[in-house]
UniProtKB/Swiss-Prot annotation:
Main localisation: membrane
Bilayer topology term: Single-pass type II membrane protein
Keyword Transmembrane helix tagged: yes
Sequence ranges on the Cytoplasmic membrane side: 1-7
Domain of life, per lineage: Bacteria
Protein's gene: ccmE
The name this protein goes by in its record: Cytochrome c-type biogenesis protein CcmE
Ranges of the Periplasmic topological domain: 29-133
Length: 133
């Protein structure tokens, strides 16, 4: 092979390897992105909620938190629609009525059975002595 052909072959192989690795990385990133749907989107029926776990995000409605023996239920809203969430487990420390949460789980008979609750926090950090009391 001539030197020119070897160089061309090297460049082509390098682009193929680089392109393949970019496709693999982007595919893995796409499968790990954690979007969430609003209660309005879920209740509109435009999302297939029966197949896999989905994430629903919204604000916990004040006064809706109920604790049973080993279950917790509450309603989340996006200020248009609301969904009842049922959860079994320990709630995160930042969870409270009126706070924003993301629940991961499945819709079953009109209510959302969560297997994970993530509490969203305020983006403004304030040390303890500066927080409102």
């Amino acid at each position: 092979m001539k030197r020119k052909h070897k160089r061309l072959l090297f460049i082509i192989v390098t682009f193929i390897i680089f392109g393949s690795s970019v496709v693999i990385v982007l595919n893995k990133l796409r499968s790990n992105i954690s979007f969430f749907f609003t209660p309005t989107e879920v209740l509109s029926g435009s999302i297939n909620v029966s197949s896999n776990d989905i994430r629903i995000g919204g604000m916990v409605i004040s006064g809706s938190l109920k604790r049973y023996d080993n279950l917790i239920s509450f309603f989340i809203t996006d200020l248009e629609s609301q969904i009842k969430v049922v959860y079994q487990g320990i709630l995160p420390p930042l969870f409270s009525e009126g706070s924003w949460v993301v629940a991961k789980g499945k819709m079953v008979n009109g209510e959302f059975n969560a297997n994970e609750i993530l509490a969203k926090h305020d983006e403004n950090y304030k040390p303890g002595k500066y927080r409102a009391k």
